[in-house]
């Protein structure tokens, strides 16, 4: 008797599978939620090509429907000139019939079908869909496996931590319910014959499904995109392990998920081969034909999408033309050379633009600046006497310094810890009903009280004690005064203040909402999805420190002795600005400055009311402000603010060039003056860090609009938290949902975000921009592969840098 030799996985096949897992971009958990370009791992290829492939792979949409674009054209949002220009770009020159041609619905061909999908085409209507049950089973298993509060699945050997695939196989082999749900009596036994080793499984699938290199790559990508939510979260786990220098050999999470999906495909194939050979023969015919036609499939989708691409480009051209005219037709604001009364440094966030403009209207002696919201501090925050630690910097970076309150009184710490325990209990997935049940009438009263008399809810770690001093450590060692001075100098060198006002406000931002699982997504993305309060408090503490000031002076950085750095927080939901006293002996904020802030708040609220609630436009300032606060605290409110919706540009220039302009809260604003940057090192940092963050934000909003099913999270009302902070389900099943909810994008009547790729405007010499793009592949990819637009804005002229050439905008 001869034993059949099992197939082995070649290095080429292993690399193709690895490459497929690396195409998935990470998605951060709810408590650290930041915006991410869901296609970040693919920016080394042209955007149009990726759009064609994603459409062919999984029916993913990166453009709006032609009907939507045509409606925007009829509204005047897309100009005929820009439409013609976009059509010429794609080789469509039939001017007379152009509009009629572009207005036709783009009938897309079918997308790739996995084995389960092909089986469903022949499945009786009274039976559970293979695809739906696979998604449900895998998704529910992942939720249980990665449950953060407490494990909900047992393992046979608790001392031997299983990887995702091995644990799934162990649990599934004991799951008799699958056969019942699917109405397939013998289904479960087909899992018993699956190999426990992932590579052995991959080799079996490749052999039995007759996959060559091209179809293997396509198949693997399609399977991961089919459960893109969990793929993205597991990519985050891989990323976080890699950033912490942990070895992925223990468990590459995305690879394990791919193994589970392939295992299901193999089980369906083998099961039908055993129980319905005629049906499998039909499926095999389609499968073989599909594999051989992959290039044709992509080409068919490319051809079908051409009209959508023209419309999308025309929309971008139209938006850019309007902004170009705004930037070049008005003279720059002439700022006074005298010392300002007040300087306020804000985050570059688009929501800051509205408030900055309102604040500047109060006096010509006010100067505002834009800077990355983490204020250059590479920190993580550790709550005092607690194990709770969270990053306070962009997701792309790793914290080098830990900050902790050094003088919080014991009463405050005890209260904070008690609130944290209550918060964890109330937010744990299994606790929702047991909490109400065990607390009985008292909790019912609390819920009733919150409904009638709502108040601000926040994580206990955000309730910092007043007048806090900070302890800064690096790898457990306290920073010396010299270390602090060097840290402060590096930040001030980047901000490049040429003069210092008596009051310099360091304004972080945060969003205060109630009953909002995605609250972190409205916080400061540059602070890792947290409020910027810790960052501004720590930096103000450093810059007000007498010893640090003395050392800075010795380094040649003279700060006037009467200059006080004041930490503040801009509440983006209510547009209230709160100042924090850094020390007990700090000078009180002048009444005039407080009045400026209040008037700016009223102006900003009036502007935002037009989009949030038009009924508030006729209200008094006080009534409107009260309504904004009520809206923020209302736990039934699904749309407390519009966040960064409708962002479309990033302007890197001196503020005096835009101070006179109404940019409608759509532009990220980063102060930059090339005259203060002789070696262009600051510009290089901006183009390789903040620009990437703004691109991530822009693409998350764009793709959440164009395909909310794959890249958005659907209806917020139906959300249920998964495993603590992992993410959300829409309802009680399906894939993990990522991205933005419909309530963050659409007011029920129209889209509040226009999906256009980011336009970046830089005031700097062309040669400097060219050198930075040539030096950094990621910058070059974003520009030349059409993931964003890069313009030079100089002397009231705009020129686009693309494919290593400059093109004047007309």
Swiss-Prot record:
Protein origin, superkingdom: Bacteria
GO terms of molecular function: zinc ion binding
Keyword Zinc listed: yes
Keyword field: Cell inner membrane, Cell membrane, Membrane, Metal-binding, Transport, Zinc
Residue positions binding Zn(2+): 347, 349, 509, 524
GO CC field: plasma membrane
Function as written in the Swiss-Prot or TrEMBL entry: Part of an energy-coupled inorganic carbon pump.
Record-linked PANTHER family: INORGANIC CARBON TRANSPORTER SUBUNIT DABA-RELATED, UPF0753 PROTEIN AQ_863
Family: Belongs to the inorganic carbon transporter (TC 9.A.2) DabA family.
Record text on subunit structure and interactions: Forms a complex with DabB.
Protein name per its UniProtKB record: Probable inorganic carbon transporter subunit DabA
Lineage: Bacteria, Pseudomonadati, Pseudomonadota, Gammaproteobacteria, Oceanospirillales
Gene: dabA
């Amino acid at each position: 008797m001869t034993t059949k030799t099992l197939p082995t996985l070649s290095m080429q096949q292993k690399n193709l599978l690895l490459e497929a897992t690396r195409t998935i971009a990470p998605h951060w958990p709810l408590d650290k939620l930041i915006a991410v370009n869901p296609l970040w791992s693919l920016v080394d290829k042209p955007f149009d090509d990726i759009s064609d492939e994603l459409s062919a792979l999984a029916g993913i949409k990166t453009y709006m429907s032609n009907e939507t674009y045509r409606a925007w054209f009829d509204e005047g949002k897309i100009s005929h000139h820009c439409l013609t220009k976009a059509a010429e770009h794609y080789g469509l020159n039939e001017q007379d019939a152009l509009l009629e041609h572009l207005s036709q619905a783009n009938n897309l061909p079918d997308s790739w079908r996995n084995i389960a999908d092909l089986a469903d085409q022949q499945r009786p209507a009274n039976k559970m869909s293979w695809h739906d049950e696979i998604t449900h089973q895998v998704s529910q298993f992942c939720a249980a496996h990665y449950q953060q509060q407490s494990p909900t699945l047992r393992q046979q050997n608790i001392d031997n931590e299983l990887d995702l695939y091995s644990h799934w196989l162990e649990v599934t082999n004991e799951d008799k319910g699958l056969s019942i749900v699917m109405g397939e009596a013998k289904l479960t036994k087909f899992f018993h014959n699956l190999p426990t080793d992932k590579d052995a499984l991959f080799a079996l699938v490749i052999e039995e499904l007759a996959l060559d290199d091209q179809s293997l790559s396509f198949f693997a990508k399609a399977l991961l995109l089919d459960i893109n939510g969990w793929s993205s979260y597991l990519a985050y786990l891989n990323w976080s392990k890699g950033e912490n220098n942990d070895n992925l050999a223990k468990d590459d999470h995305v690879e394990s998920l791919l193994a589970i999906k392939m295992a299901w495909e193999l089980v369906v194939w083998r099961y039908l081969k055993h129980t319905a050979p005629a049906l499998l023969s039909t499926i095999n015919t389609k499968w073989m034909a599909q594999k051989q036609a992959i290039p044709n499939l992509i080409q068919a989708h490319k051809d079908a999408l051409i009209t959508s691409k023209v419309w999308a480009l025309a929309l971008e051209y139209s938006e850019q033309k309007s902004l170009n005219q705004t930037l070049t037709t008005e003279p720059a604001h002439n700022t006074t050379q005298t010392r300002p009364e007040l300087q306020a440094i804000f985050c570059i966030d688009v929501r800051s633009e509205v408030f900055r403009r309102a604040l500047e209207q109060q006096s010509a002696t006010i100067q505002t600046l834009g800077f990355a919201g983490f204020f250059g501090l590479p920190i993580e925050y550790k709550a005092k006497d607690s194990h709770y630690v969270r990053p306070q910097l962009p997701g792309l970076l790793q914290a080098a310094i830990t900050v902790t309150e050094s003088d919080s009184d014991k009463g405050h710490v005890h209260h904070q810890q008690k609130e944290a325990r209550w918060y964890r209990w109330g937010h744990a997935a299994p606790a929702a009903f047991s909490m109400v049940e065990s607390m009985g009438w008292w909790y019912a009263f609390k819920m009733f009280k919150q409904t009638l008399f709502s108040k601000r809810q926040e994580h206990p770690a955000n309730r910092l004690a007043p007048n806090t001093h900070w302890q800064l450590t690096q790898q457990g060692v306290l920073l010396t005064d010299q270390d602090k001075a060097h840290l402060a100098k590096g930040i001030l060198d980047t901000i490049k203040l040429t003069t210092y006002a008596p009051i310099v406000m360091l304004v972080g931002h945060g969003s205060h909402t109630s009953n909002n699982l995605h609250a972190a997504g409205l916080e400061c993305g540059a602070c890792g999805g947290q409020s910027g309060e810790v960052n501004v408090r720590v930096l103000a503490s450093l810059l007000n420190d007498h010893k640090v000031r003395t050392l800075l002076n010795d380094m040649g950085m003279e700060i006037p002795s009467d200059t006080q750095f004041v930490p503040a927080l801009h509440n983006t939901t209510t547009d209230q600005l709160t100042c924090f006293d850094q020390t007990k002996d700090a000078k009180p904020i002048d009444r005039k400055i407080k009045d400026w802030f209040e008037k700016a708040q009223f102006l900003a609220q009036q502007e935002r009311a037009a989009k949030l609630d038009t009924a508030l436009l006729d209200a008094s300032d006080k009534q409107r402000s009260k309504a904004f606060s009520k809206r923020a605290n209302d736990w039934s409110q699904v749309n407390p603010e519009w966040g960064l919706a409708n962002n479309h540009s990033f302007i890197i220039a001196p503020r005096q060039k835009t101070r006179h302009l109404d940019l409608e809260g759509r532009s990220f604003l980063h102060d930059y003056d090339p005259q203060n940057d002789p070696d262009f090192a600051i510009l290089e940092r901006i183009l390789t860090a903040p620009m990437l963050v703004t691109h991530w934000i822009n693409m998350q909003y764009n793709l959440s609009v164009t395909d909310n099913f794959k890249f958005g999270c659907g209806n917020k009302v139906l959300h249920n938290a998964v495993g603590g902070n992992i993410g959300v389900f829409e309802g009680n099943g399906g894939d993990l949902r990522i991205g933005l909810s419909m309530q963050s994008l659409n007011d029920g009547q129209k889209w509040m975000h226009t999906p256009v790729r980011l336009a970046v405007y830089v005031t700097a010499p062309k040669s400097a921009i060219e050198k930075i793009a040539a030096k950094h592949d990621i910058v070059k990819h974003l520009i030349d592969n059409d993931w964003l637009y890069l313009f030079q804005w100089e002397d009231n002229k705009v020129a686009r840098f693309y494919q290593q050439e400059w093109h004047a905008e007309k």
